[in-house]
Amino acid sequence: IEIFGVGGSKMLSQGLKPIFNIKFLSIMGIFEVLLKLPKILKLLKLTKRKIIEIKPDIVITIDAPGFNLRLQKSIKSLNVKQIHYVAPSVWAWKSYRAKKISKFLDHLLVLFPFEKKFFIKEGLSTTFVGHPIAFDDNFDKNIYNVEKSLNDKLLKKIALLPGSRLGEIKKLMPVFIKAAHLLNKDYKSIKFYI
């Protein structure tokens, strides 16, 4: 089996032959997207050309719907099996996307069990696979420690959620930390969770 694509260090360590560096897609916000749009469109075309050249048996895309679902739609005419992992949050907004992607995807892998119904209703073969964090070896231990701390009625708890993309974390985390320090000066009974 040969695996070509766009991925990070973990996928590269498993033998992925990269088309380009995934860091180019790690962007946040409309302004950053607009600045990098010409590069993103070039990478989209490059990826499609590579798929045409390689003639794969299957194309599997992971998350990044702005890039990957456009790619999947653009290669529909190639008659290659298409699977996407991490459904767009159609249950939260833009529910029409479920119908849209059912026209070009062959199968969808979803993180949450309630997501299935939105896509099955549109005729898209869908499988619930679970969230990867649930398979983390340290997950149970971390949950236990968090639950133990959350049960402390004297503490106020605040979650700091800077995002998952490096760009988001770099921009938001310093602001979150500054806010946490300011709050901690006045309120000693606060515990922050990241």
Region spans (language model):
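Charged active-site motifs of nucleotide-sugar-dependent glycosyltransferases
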Residues: 151-159, 190-191
